[in-house]
């Protein structure tokens, strides 16, 4: 199906944005390593429900502009991109829904621009205030000599070289090792006491297993589309979001101590690795204390990290029911 894209001038750059449907706008924000295409299963159901669907390629991705400076990928810059899209469309306000990195982007858009955001929904990554020490320092303390991907991503060039060597293989490994099937396999491996965790000198893809077949949620044509998007963009811009985490902490620490005021919805899969992001802590259990008006908190059984792609019908129903009651 042919889609309607507009190159939207916003915040000094141009953002490739899918805009379809009529009604109250809903902004969908993708994560890493993804694309507007990650929301392909949401477009028609939301249009039919009477919403204007707005799905940008976040700066650095796909056909959107790719600023060269690392600091150009801060939460403050990206949230300004989104508000600029609303300004361009002459929309007073909107609902916002984000997955993976798109979730923090959505949470902070609601905090930075409360008058522009009617409701906020996050998939996979709940809202939590920043710690009193910077994220990179915190992760070094938590993971010590073990490998942690965010620390691996910090130095420009190293992760790019590994991940861009064979884009299709990279994406296949990432998608298929973090979905429900991949996570079950990882849990089985973790029970094998002879297997040692990766040390901090490992690479990102090291230890990931090649799937025999693509999972049902990811068709060959889907993988091809994502692959072509990253052949266009490379990994530099997308990885810079991780490199701005300490900058985000500096700029937004005080703001992060506020609770989300808008009607809120949080959805994740029972097998999403983000639930176990911090050793010994289940993040889903703590969801609720950082929101003033959390209407929905859903854990979908047998779903991994790619929430709205692995369980589109369930996610669409939860989100549309939530929005209908606002």
Describe each PLM feature range.
Residues 21, 89-92, 326:
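Glycine-rich phosphate-binding loop signature in dinucleotide/nucleotide-binding domains
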Residues 58, 125, 302:
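Active-site loop/turn elements of alpha/beta-hydrolase fold enzymes
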Residues 3-7, 53-55, 296-299:
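Conserved beta-strand scaffold positions in the cores of enzyme catalytic domains, especially
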Residues 292-326:
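Catalytic active-site module of serine/aspartate enzymes centered on a nucleophile-bearing elbow/loop
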Residues 1-3, 15, 61-97, 101-295:
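Flexible "cap/lid" subdomain of the alpha/beta-hydrolase fold that forms the substrate-access gate
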């Amino acid at each position: 199906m042919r889609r309607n894209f507009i190159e939207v001038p916003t915040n000094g750059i141009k953002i490739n944005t899918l805009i379809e449907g009529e009604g109250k706008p809903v902004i969908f924000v993708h994560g890493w390593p993804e694309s507007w295409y990650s929301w392909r299963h949401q477009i028609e159901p939301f249009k039919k429900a009477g919403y204007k669907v707005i799905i940008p390629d976040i700066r650095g991705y796909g056909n959107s502009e790719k600023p060269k400076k690392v600091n150009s990928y801060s939460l403050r810059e990206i949230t300004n991109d989104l508000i600029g899209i609303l300004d361009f469309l002459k929309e007073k306000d909107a609902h916002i829904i984000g997955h993976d990195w798109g979730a923090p982007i959505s949470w902070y858009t609601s905090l930075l621009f409360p008058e522009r955001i009617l409701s906020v929904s996050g998939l996979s990554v709940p809202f939590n205030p920043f710690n009193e020490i910077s994220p990179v320092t915190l992760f070094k303390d938590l993971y010590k000599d073990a490998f942690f991907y965010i620390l691996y991503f910090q130095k420009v060039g190293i992760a790019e070289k590994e991940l861009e060597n064979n884009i299709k293989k990279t994406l296949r490994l990432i998608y298929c090792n973090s979905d429900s099937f991949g996570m079950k396999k990882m849990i089985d491996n973790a029970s094998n006491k002879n297997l040692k965790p990766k040390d901090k000198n490992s690479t990102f893809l090291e230890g990931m297993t090649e799937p025999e077949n693509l999972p049902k949620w990811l068709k060959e044509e889907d993988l091809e589309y994502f692959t072509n998007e990253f052949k266009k963009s490379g990994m530099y811009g997308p990885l810079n979001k991780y490199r701005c985490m300490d900058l985000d902490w500096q700029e937004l620490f005080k703001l992060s101590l506020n609770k989300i005021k808008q009607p809120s919805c949080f959805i994740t899969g029972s097998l999403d690795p983000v639930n176990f992001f911090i050793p010994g802590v289940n993040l889903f259990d703590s969801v609720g204390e950082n929101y003033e008006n959390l209407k929905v908190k859903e854990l979908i059984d047998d779903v991994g990290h790619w929430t709205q792609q692995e369980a589109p019908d369930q996610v669409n129903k939860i989100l549309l029911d939530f929005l209908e009651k606002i």
